[in-house]
Amino acid sequence: MQKISVASAALLLALSFQATAAEPKEEMTTSGIGITMLKEGSGASPKASDTVKVHYRGTLTDGKEFDSSYRRNEPATFPLNRVIPCWTEGVQKIKVGGKAKLVCPSNLAYGSRGVPGIPPNSTLIFEVELLDIAK
């Protein structure tokens, strides 16, 4: 009976270490963007001058969704240097095929002006899946 208990304890310990190691960690950029890699890509990373094709979901910190290409069932394509600074910097950290969570401080998003559906001075949270880079 004791052998089963020791084996069970060892298995639970191994599983808890594996679960802890598998949790993605948020990294902060020097500008203040929080980036968590949810899925590692295997392709190239874009440059600010590239046009990217992405699927994304944007929410406020309370979880309210303000935009989603998934909901529209159509990826978005845009020049990376023509979006909010958080995206220009953050999406460059993702490889094609990868997915990341970007936590964008308001000064790197829409700041004090806000936009319809996004109040002024809002921190924004995006899940961004990089599908392709058009050079």
Question: Language-model segments: what does each one mean?
Answer:
Residues 2-135:
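Cross-family detector of peptidyl-prolyl cis-trans isomerase
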